[in-house]
Each structure stands twice: as structure tokens, then as C-alpha cells.
Amino acid sequence: MKYLFTLLYLLSFSTFTHAQDFENPGDYMGFISKQQENVSKKFMSYTSASAHGKKEKKVEALRNKLLDEVQESRMNISGMPGYKTDKSYRDSAVSFMKLYYNVLNEDYSKIINMEEIAEQSYDAMEAYLLMEEKVSEKLNEGNERMKAAQKVFAAKNNVNLINSQSELGDMMQQVHDMNLYHHQIYLIFFKPFKQEAYLLEAIEKNNITGIEQNKNSLLKYAQDGLVKLNSIKPFKGDNSIAAACKTMLNFYVKEVNDKMGTVSDFFLTKERFATIKKEFEKKSNPTKAEIDAYNKGVADINKASNAYNQNNQTLNQQRTEALNNWNSAIKTFFDGHTPHYK
């Protein structure tokens, strides 16, 4: 299962002329703003390609272009003189570019490493998604410091800032909000999804105690998830992944309540028959009653086996349908809500 990793890079751009006349405070700010805008465009190209199923090689190439743009912008800004000896605004912009570059390198590598083990447990998945959110928050905090420096510079030099969100900024905000929404739905899905894997493992090992313990946990997680889903509002009117998650959780509830009884009956019958067979094979001259009891045991295990196999076939079909529906909903959700940007 592939996850979309994105970073929030959201700067407020002010409209200035971009001639490199650093004697004019508006032009000074405009030059820095242009560098930030260039980075944001590369970011959106990378994010759009990641979300819309572009080949991994192309996505990685776009990430490298983003890194190059960050470095170039940082060098362009650091090469600026201070404005009338005041270097604070310039240095704040350079610091943010350094932060952004480090995030794309160091934090990105950590997240990729965490992704490799994220599916091993719910805790690992939660930590992976939380790491993504912390990285975005780190950038957001850096962005707030950058905006504060911009306001201080503007006030000090009598520049009138217009607080308006750009189209590019709107796109990046939507990506951020979309990811947060997806994370909360995904964790609701993943907890019982992983728990069912433990249940199926116990079934494969004929572990009756493990089956009972894991099915009870699965039922609890699925029911808890259904309650949580009821409190989550649709994303921009789109309830598709919540609905797909609900379908998946309802499958788990039905699996435990309606189907696990057949599984437990099979293993108990199998266990009883093993005892009957062992005792029967000890007898060199069994009585008619003993033969009848053995034959009944054979009939019981055959009946239980047939029911078990049919039960598994039904579950496998329903599980596959629900998972396909879930995966399709996730793909459609990202395709529909991630802005297309070249």
C-alpha cells in the first residue's frame, strides 16, 4: 500500500514589482517573495505528481528539482545586501530555506524509513503519520516566523501589505487539509485491518485461544471506529473514504458476529475428532457402539470442514470486495482533491 507524503509549504505572497532595485523596500520584499514563489511552484508540481499516480522515477526527479530550487533560492536571497544595513528580513528568509531543505533531506529520509515498517503494527503506522504531521508543523512554524519578519520589515519601511491568499497558497492549504483528513480516516481503518491480520494468523495456526482473543479485539476496534466515523465531517462535501471505511468496518463486525462461530466450531470439532480417532485406533476389536461413535465423529468433522471452507470462501470474497472498494475510494479521493499542477 502506497502513502502520499507531502509537506505543507505555505507562504503569503505579496504583490510587488520584481526589478532588483534594492533601494526600494517594496522591490526588496518582491525579490524575496519571487524566490519563495518559485519554490512553491516546484513543490506543487512534486505534490501533484505524487498524488496523481506519476511514475516513481518522475516523482523523484521532481523532488530533486524542488531541492535544487530551494538551494538556488537560498543562494539568491543570501546574496542580497541588507536593506539599509538591516539584514533581519533577508536572514529570516535564508533560515527558512535552510529549514525547508533540511526537511526535504533529513526528515524526508526518516519518514521514508518509517514507511518501510509502518504496516507492521498500528503503533508504527500511527508514528509514521504523526511524523508527517510534525514535519508539516515544523515548516508551518518556520513559515509563521517568516511572515512575522515580513510584517516587521513592512512596518519599519512603510510598505502596505495586502493580506490575500494566492491561488498557489490555496492549493497548498488544500493539500495540507486533505492529508490531515485522510490520516484520521486511515488510522480508523488500519487498527481493525491490522487486528484482522492477527486473527487470520491465529486461524492459520489452529490457535483457538488466539482466535477468541483476536476476534474480540477486532470487534471492539471495528465498533469503536464506527462511532468515531460518525463524528467526522465530510471533506469539502466528500464523504467517500469515510463511507468506504464504514463498509470495511461493518465487514469486520459481520465477520466476528456471523462468521467466527463457524470457525470456532470447526476447530473444536477437529479437536474432538482427533481425540476420538486416537482412542479408536488403540482398539483392536472395537464394539459396534465404538464404531458408530467414530463414524459419527467422521461425519461431524466432514460437515464442519465443508461449512468452514464455504465460510472462508464467502469471507475472502467479501473482504476482497470491501478492500478493493476502500483502495479505489482512496485513489479517487486523492485524484479529486489534489490540485493538478505542472
Which residues fall in each region the model found?
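Bacterial Sec-dependent N-terminal signal peptides
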Residues: M1-D27, K342
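C-terminal amphipathic alpha-helix
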Residues: D21-K54, E115-I211, K215, K270-K342
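Short, solvent-exposed, charged loop/turn and helix-capping segments
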Residues: S73-V94, N113-M114, G225-T247, G261-K270
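A structural signal for well-ordered alpha-helices, especially hydrophobic packing surfaces
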Residues: F43, T47, R74-I77, Y101-Y108, ...
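Interface faces of extended alpha-helical assemblies
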Residues: N38, K110, I188-K191, Q195, ...
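Generic structural concept
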Residues: L67, V94-M97, Y101, L219, ...
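Post-signal peptide N-terminal segment of secreted/secretory-pathway proteins
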Residues: T47-L130
